[in-house]
Structure formats: C-alpha cells, structure tokens
C-alpha cells in the first residue's frame, strides 16, 4: 500500500508532499492505538519485594540475547527469518530504481509501473496470507509452506534476470509477493513454536519473541545496504538478484534444519 501511495506523488510538482503524508501516517500509527487501546495498569505497586538494584539487574539481564543452550532451533529460526526477509527486501525496496536504472524507464514511466507493481504485490500477498496460514494448521506443518515461499522468492528474483523489462519486474512482484504472503502467514507461528519450554514455564517467552523481531528488523536494515554495495561494485542490479536468491536458499536451509517443528 505504501508503494502505491508513493507512486501517486512520484514525478509530480507536489512530490515532496509524499514525505509529509508518510510522516503523518507514521505518527498516526502510534497515536491512534494509544487512544483506542485500554490504559495499561501501572506495575509500580505490584510489591514483588525486589530492591531497586535487583530490579535493575533483572532488567539488564532481560536485554541480553537468550541463552544458546536448549534454544538451537530458536536461533536457526531467527537466522532463517533474517535471511528470508533480507532476500525479499533486497529487491522490493529498490524496485523504483530497478525500473529506472535497470529497465531504463523515465521517472513518469517508473511511477506508473510502480502503481501496477504495488497493486500486484498487494493482491498476491493477500492470497498467500489467506491460504498459507490455514493450510499450515491443517497439515500441521510449518516448514513446508516456508519451503514453498523460498521457491517463489527464487523464481521471482530470477525473472528480472531472464526478462530485463517491465514485465520481468512485474513477474518478480507476482512470485515474490505471493511468496512473502505465504512466508509471513507461517513465520510468526514458527518462531513461537521454537521457543524453549523452559522459557514458556518461566514466562520469558516475550524476550524470545522480541529477539525474533530483532532478526526480522535486521534483515530489512541490512538488505538495502547490501544491494547498494553490490550495485556500486558491479554497476548493475544483476548480482543483487542472484545474491537475493542465494539468501532465500540459505534462509530456508536453516529453517529446514530445525528439528523440533514439522
């Protein structure tokens, strides 16, 4: 949806207003939930009997990564998540520049193509989300849908390599967008399933979920930097497509290595 809205401003005299609209939407995403959600009860009077120093020490310990012992599958899932998200973001965050510098479109032509690409991505992602989650629950397996998502990622990233055209990039959006929807629908459940039982008993599962989200964010942060470096070194997006496919392959390999989840 964000890509579609930004394409409406691209190449227009009011192009800079896109930044203003984006900033307002970011602000609204924080303010609206704050106004709607019930007020959270204060914990200052819980009376757990801990001194200030003990509470501070516990808070600092909670910021440390989970222990590796008993959490091997969890770290495999985190590594797989980082690589899968990096694979998708390496290309999806650069589609505008791919249209302009790889395919050779003008700014106006790229803006029109971005609108089409965003619509394609939106539709196929919803289809992937709607099908993958219920299917995963029905077959009681997490790794199978993720393997399918990986195949879709790889097919998508190779389409612009084989077809250096608008249609090639749109094929990327169709395959990779569908793969993204399939993956996102199952990824969260997988990362909950691999949380060690000890953490569930100690009620520290939130720490594991937070660390898993960090892996997700790191993948999206490292991806554009990696693409920029590859393009700067090679002078083309060709290598970025190949590396993106390899990241997806490495990510799904880690996930398939998980032993505690089917």
Over which residues does each language-model region extend?
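A membrane-interface helix-boundary motif in multi-pass transporters
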Residues: 8-24, 227-248
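Helix-to-loop junctions at the C-terminal end of transmembrane segments
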Residues: 10, 128-141
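Multi-pass alpha-helical transporter architecture, strongest
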Residues: 28-37, 222, 242-262
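Juxtamembrane intracellular "pre-TM" segments in multi-pass secondary transporters
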Residues: 40-79
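Short amphipathic helix-loop junctions that connect adjacent transmembrane helices
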Residues: 93-112
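C-terminal ends and interior cores of transmembrane alpha-helices
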Residues: 151-164
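Intracellular juxtamembrane helix-capping segments at the cytosolic ends
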Residues: 182-200
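A late C-terminal transmembrane helix in Major Facilitator Superfamily
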Residues: 201-233
């Amino acid at each position: 949806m964000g890509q579609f809205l930004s394409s409406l401003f691209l190449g227009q005299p009011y192009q800079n207003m896109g930044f203003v609209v984006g900033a307002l939407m970011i602000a609204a995403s924080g303010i609206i939930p704050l106004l709607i959600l019930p007020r959270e009860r204060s914990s200052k009077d819980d009376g757990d009997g801990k001194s200030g120093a003990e509470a501070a020490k516990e808070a600092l310990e909670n910021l440390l990564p989970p222990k590796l012992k008993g959490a091997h599958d969890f770290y495999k899932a985190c590594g797989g998540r980082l690589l899968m998200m990096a694979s998708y973001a390496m290309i999806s965050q650069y589609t505008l520049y791919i249209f302009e510098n790889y395919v050779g479109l003008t700014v106006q032509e790229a803006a029109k193509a971005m609108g089409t690409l965003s619509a394609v991505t939106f539709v196929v992602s919803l289809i992937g989300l709607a099908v993958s989650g219920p299917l995963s629950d029905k077959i009681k397996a997490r790794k199978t849908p993720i393997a399918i998502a990986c195949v879709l990622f790889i097919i998508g990233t190779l389409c612009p390599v084989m077809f250096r055209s608008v249609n090639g990039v749109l094929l990327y959006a169709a395959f990779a967008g569908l793969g993204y929807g399939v993956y996102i629908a199952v990824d969260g459940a997988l990362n909950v399933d691999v949380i060690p039982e000890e953490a569930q008993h100690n009620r520290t599962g939130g720490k594991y979920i937070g660390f898993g989200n960090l892996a997700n964010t790191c993948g999206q942060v490292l991806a554009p930097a990696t693409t920029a470096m590859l393009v700067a070194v090679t002078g083309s997006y060709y290598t970025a497509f190949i590396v993106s496919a390899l990241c997806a392959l490495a990510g799904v390999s880690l996930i398939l290595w998980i032993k505690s989840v089917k």
